Amino acid sequence: MPDTNAVVVVNTAAVPIAVTSHWHFFEANRQLDFDRAAAWGRRLAIPTGSTIRWEPGETHTVTLRPFAGRRIAYGFAGLVNGPLDADGALPAALALARDRGYLGVGA
């Protein structure tokens, strides 16, 4: 997994959306449209405690970095709740996100 990658993110909501530095970006607000598979196991590459905010219709290119340590995600939006590197974890989370109306998960 590369150290960082860039993802283009669009806020399709009618309200502002903010994401903090610690958040598993794959599980960010369902109305943010971006390649969620590219965000798997990653967080924003910004200083701890910082936030990026999108106004309605706004687009930002963000840099993401991998989670370190044990790479287990619990909570957030409830799309993972287990090891990020487990066999089948990404396809299962993409299917759940699709079922819950998340953008950026493919057809």
Model-derived regions, located:
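Short alpha-helical interface elements
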Residues: L32-F34, L44, T48, L79-A89
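Intrinsic-disorder/low-complexity, polar/charged segments enriched in Ser/Thr/Lys/Arg/Asp/Glu/Gln
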Residues: P2-A6, T59-T61
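Terminal connector regions
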Residues: T61-A107
